[in-house]
Amino acid sequence: MGVTSVLLWKDSNGQGMMKFHERITTTLLGSAKDKWAIQVKLYRDIKSTGTDDVIVEAEREMENILEKLKNLWLLRQTIVYDGNTYIIGDFLIRVAYPKTTNSNYKGMLVEVEYTSTINPHVAAPILHEFIEMLKPPEIDIVKWEPDDEHSFSKIGLSEDAFTRAHTDYQYMMLFKMENLL
């Protein structure tokens, strides 16, 4: 695992995946690696009135645990994104559309991973430059970035070694920012 950056690629007409595939494979000479999917579930705490956010990374067994604790948690919404993984040098690019597009459709999820380091300070400028090269000028992207109020260290994550939990936190913040759930 390297350092990732999570983006929302604004795509109002739904043609982004074709354009993205063409740009990656033709213009940037990347190759399609395999299929990629991500499933996002939003649970609500039945008893709590607080607004604290919690990230839980778990395998399918977590659903069994939550089922046993169903009097504490309520599944509010599930969204499945399907797409592809591409590779260009030291970068893995994962892109996916929501399986069911509805009136709230806002674009594609894009996860760009720089695989040569786990240090976010080293990877940040490299990822920024690569993302700028990756996106066509007419496309808007939305990206959550840590700041003083919402930093990785404020939730107990390392500022020097990137993990899957860092990526999960980016997804959570992006989904909150863009009202994707």
What are these regions (language model features)?
Residues 139-181:
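Short, highly charged C-terminal tails/helix-capping segments
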Residues 13-14, 117-119:
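Helix N-cap motif at beta-to-alpha junctions
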Residues 1-10, 18, 22-63, 92-96, ...:
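Polyanion/phosphate-binding surface patch
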Residues 25-42, 71-80, 137-146:
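Short secondary-structure junctions
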Residues 115-117, 177:
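Positively charged, low-complexity, intrinsically disordered RNA-binding extensions
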Residues 47-88:
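Charged surface patches that recognize polyanionic ligands
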Residues 119-149:
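Mixed-charge, glycine-accented linear interaction segment located at domain edges/termini
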